Amino acid sequence: SIRRQRQMCIRDREKLIDSNQEAKRLMGELGVGLISTEQFCDAARNLTLTTVSNHQIIEAANRMLVVIPDEKKRRLLKLKAKGYRLFLLSNTIDIHWDYCVEKLFPYQGHNVEDYFEKVFLSQRLHLSKPDARIYEEVIRQAAIVPEESLFIDDLQENCVAAENLGIHTFQNVEFDDWLDLEL
């Protein structure tokens, strides 16, 4: 009957919403290091009712990553050569970070250590942007003066959180807006 089909559709929709919320929760927990990559992969298999390997899950997760244009890497190298202290603060997971280090950052013999003095990752700090504590930790570990620092991020909420601590910000709305900054 139509009523039974409608009820089945509603149940299926609710399951889909629940599984989507569960996936977001898992990514959030992985993103701040509350669960390991192995635990994440196990949960992903349970959620999707599949028997795929950890390697297959990691490959699928990394497909969402985009190229870092050479122009950006050249600009980072130039800024560092000018004496700017460059740090990277990223809400990322080790799965993605390992891929970025291996595949996206290498450029003409350079690697991630050549661009940044230090890298701060949410999964390793057990905090994520826009939580003020992650910025405070970067300020402390990097020994930077907020009023003399510029934070570039694509999300307004992350910029606002940094501004609240006295850090100058630039919201990078388009993929490469920050390249136009006069530094």
Predicted regions and their residues:
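Generic hydrophobic alpha-helical segments
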Residues: L26-L30, L76, F116
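Asp-based, Mg2+/Mn2+-dependent phosphohydrolase catalytic module
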Residues: I93-D94, V101-L183
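Substrate-recognition element of Asp-dependent hydrolases with the DxDx(T/V) motif
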Residues: N54-P106
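Single conserved hydrophobic/aromatic residue that forms the stacking wall/gate
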Residues: S1-I10
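A metal-dependent, Asp-based hydrolase signature
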Residues: K24-I58
